[in-house]
From Swiss-Prot:
It comes from Arabidopsis thaliana. It is found in: Peroxisome. Disulfide bonds join C467-C576. Induction: Induced by dehydration, abscisic acid (ABA) and jasmonic acid (JA), and locally and systemically by wounding. This is Peroxisomal acyl-coenzyme A oxidase 1.
Length: 664
């Protein structure tokens, strides 16, 4: 029934202050107030309606996206929103669009790689959206292997221009968001060739379309790559292809902060350290980890609320059935995902700090922590996006058959999110980057060089290689030192084992290729340790609010002990713990599920998501699921008439046994 909170009993069970938890989740009271205000602004604006996306054709969906983006920019100007508020507005509109790449990739690329003069020229246009840009790096034939890109930029000293060319079909730019139909400009990555020498991949600002009528400029072939997975979902984005046929651009449209080409064609590296590029990479990957927390928490919110509403089995003598959330099988699948959402939130907060720290160090020409920061962000991008994609799908299954409906919000959320496993670095390739860094760190352990940052634990190798867990009872697994030591010992021992196995090969690169699977597992162990350690570090902070810290403590140990359970083979094979201690960890995990159970709905309420943002019948705040499922069903175009279109031509002949005479 309308106006009734079907989840009121669940909310009354909460043992903590939800309003205070909202502040913790948001990161600060200021961040909460901004998000809350902007989320409600978006939810109340009819232009940002999105419940009909699955029923739109691709063209209709794309046109609605253009409308929403224009309306959003208009509102930003009218309300004089600052950069933070504008970012939250785009976030809560919740529809992949060209603006994501314009603000998220095109503008940062110019800021990071353009000279002051170039920034002044191009950013003044981009910030007013007088030009719209994208980031054209990935090609049909190369993605992860950036050095394998084939597009060329050959300097012509006669005209003081670069000639941008696509020499082969596989050199076509393929996938850049915003490229297919919208972008007027792109930062194009190509092989810089001058005086007959190839200087590798560099960025160039290239105009693609006329600013008068939006038609492609001469010798440029550009379009959309086609429909992608899911209804609605990422099909609102014009991922595109792009080919150049000897397109000429002025020399000063090469991004020249890190290197330049003179009028005479001489290639000159600048005094600016090339490592600055990694600072931008740390920033981008930090935002991806934050997005992982957002996406997973949405799925968990839907699955938790619906699990509390749904009842199946367990009725005795005509009594009420059991809430699905009360089954331990449901808790064992759901609560670790709830814990993961919080864990990723806090490691994302830490990555923001890391980005600031790296930026300050780079400004002071201090590159000591850069390799570790680069490996760390690569690994966490991989870990969190993989876990989130898998977690969204698990939440769909947790909602049973109804989770398969588009109106559950979960199929579209999955289709929108899953590309994160391959964009900005394929997840397996990224973990191999982490593995190379770990092998280098292990090799230096005997040289006196002290590991730093997230690898600092390796400096205690002598202890971690021989220590044994002292756990004797289940409650011992609530000791942060015990948990950290187990995860540190596991990560170190897996890395050392890989290093020893590598040393058996005369050709180290051949050995690396042979041991790829083991190296990925070692990298994952290291990254999971980072997340666990940052969650524990969060608990060491001063966190106010009735019962808030207690709930976070429970979630922290659910996250850690579930990982221990899931990767038990690692912990046992490296002799970090005994089978008996593993059994005690499972006992403690079940106890934690029991403690979280009465707080589960309140813990997802703390995400403070509006029904508009969730866009889920199953995850409604009021829990009024079943009537709304019927409402959504009746909105489907198939229900516009009681007799389907096509009955006379195709169905009636079958039913009337008239197929032989029917004109099909």
């Amino acid at each position: 029934m309308e106006g009734i909170d079907h989840l009121a009993d669940e909310r009354n069970k909460a043992e903590f202050d939800v309003e205070d938890m909202k502040i913790v989740w948001a990161g600060s009271r200021h961040a909460f107030e901004v998000s809350d205000r902007i989320a409600r602004l978006v939810a109340s604006d009819p232009v940002f309606e999105k419940s009909n996306r699955a029923r739109l054709s691709r063209k209709e969906l794309f046109k609605s996206t253009l409308r929403k983006c224009a309306h959003a920019f208009k509102r930003i100007i009218e309300l004089r929103l600052n950069e933070e508020e504008a970012g939250r507005l785009r976030h809560f509109i919740d529809q992949p669009a060209y603006v994501d790449l314009h603000w998220g990739m095109f503008v940062p690329a110019i800021k990071g790689q353009g000279t002051e003069e170039q920034q002044k020229k191009w950013l003044s246009l981009a910030n007013k959206m007088q030009i719209i840009g994208c980031y054209a790096q990935t090609e049909l034939g190369h993605g992860s292997n950036v050095q394998g890109l084939e597009t060329t930029a050959t300097f012509d000293p006669k005209t003081d221009e670069f000639v941008i060319h696509t020499p082969t079909q596989t050199a076509s730019k393929w996938w850049p968001g915003g490229l297919g139909k919208v972008s007027t400009h792109a930062v194009v990555y190509a092989r810089l060739i001058t005086n007959g020498k190839d200087y590798g991949i560099h960025g160039f600002i290239v105009q693609l379309r006329s600013l008068e009528d939006h038609s492609p400029l001469p010798n440029i072939t550009v379009g959309d790559i086609g429909t992608k997975m899911g209804n609605g979902a990422y099909n609102s984005m014009d991922n595109g292809f792009l080919m150049f046929d000897h397109v000429r651009i002025p020399r000063d449209q090469m991004l020249m902060r890190l290197s330049k080409v003179t009028r005479e064609g001489e290639y000159v590296p600048s005094d600016v350290p090339k490592q600055l590029v990694y600072g931008t990479m740390v920033y981008v990957r930090q935002t991806i980890v934050a997005d992982a927390s957002n996406a997973l928490s949405r799925a968990v919110c839907i699955a938790t609320r619906y699990s509390a509403v749904r009842r199946q089995f367990g009725a005795h003598n005509g009594g009420i059935e059991t809430q699905v959330i009360d089954y331990k099988t449901q808790q064992n699948r759901l609560f670790p995902l709830l814990a993961s959402a919080y864990a990723f939130r806090f490691v994302g907060e830490w990555l923001k700090w890391l980005y600031t720290d790296v930026t300050e160090r780079l400004a002071a020409s201090d590159f000591a922590t850069l390799p570790e920061a680069h490996a760390c962000t690569a690994g966490l991008k991989s870990l969190t996006t993989t876990a989130t994609a898998d977690g969204i799908e698990e939440c769909r299954k947790l909602c049973g058959g109804h989770g398969y409906l588009w109106c559950s919000g979960l199929p579209e959320l999955f289709a929108v999110y899953v590309p994160a496993c391959t964009y900005e670095g394929d997840n397996v390739v990224l973990q191999l980057q982490v593995a190379r860094f770990l092998m280098k760190t292990v090799a230096q352990l005997g040289s006196g060089k002290v590991p730093v940052g997230t690898t600092a634990y390796m400096g205690r190798a002598a202890h971690l290689l021989q220590c044994r867990s002292g756990v004797q009872k289940a409650e011992d697994w609530l000791n942060p030192d015990v948990v950290l030591e187990a995860f540190e010992a596991r990560a170190l021992r897996m890395a050392v084992t890989c290093a020893k196995n590598l040393s058996k090969f005369e050709n180290q690169e051949q050995g690396f290729q042979e041991l790829l699977a083991d190296l990925v597992e070692a990298a994952i162990a290291h990254c999971q340790l980072i997340v666990v350690s940052k969650f524990i570090a969060k608990l060491e902070q001063d966190i106010g609010g009735k019962g808030v810290k207690k709930q976070l403590n429970n979630l922290c140990y659910i996250y850690a002990l579930y990982l221990l359970h899931k990767h038990l083979g690692d912990f046992l094979s490296t002799n970090c713990i005994t089978p008996k201690q593993a059994s005690l960890a499972n006992d403690q995990l079940r106890s934690l599920y029991t403690q979280v159970r009465p707080n589960a709905v309140a813990l997802v309420d703390a995400f403070n998501y509006t029904d508009h943002y969730l866009n889920s019948v199953l995850g409604r705040y009021d829990g009024n699921v079943y009537p709304k499922l019927f409402e959504e069903a009746l909105k489907d175009p198939l229900n516009d008439s009681v007799v389907p279109d096509g009955y006379q031509e195709y169905l009636r002949p079958v039913l009337q046994q008239q197929l032989r005479t029917a004109r099909l």
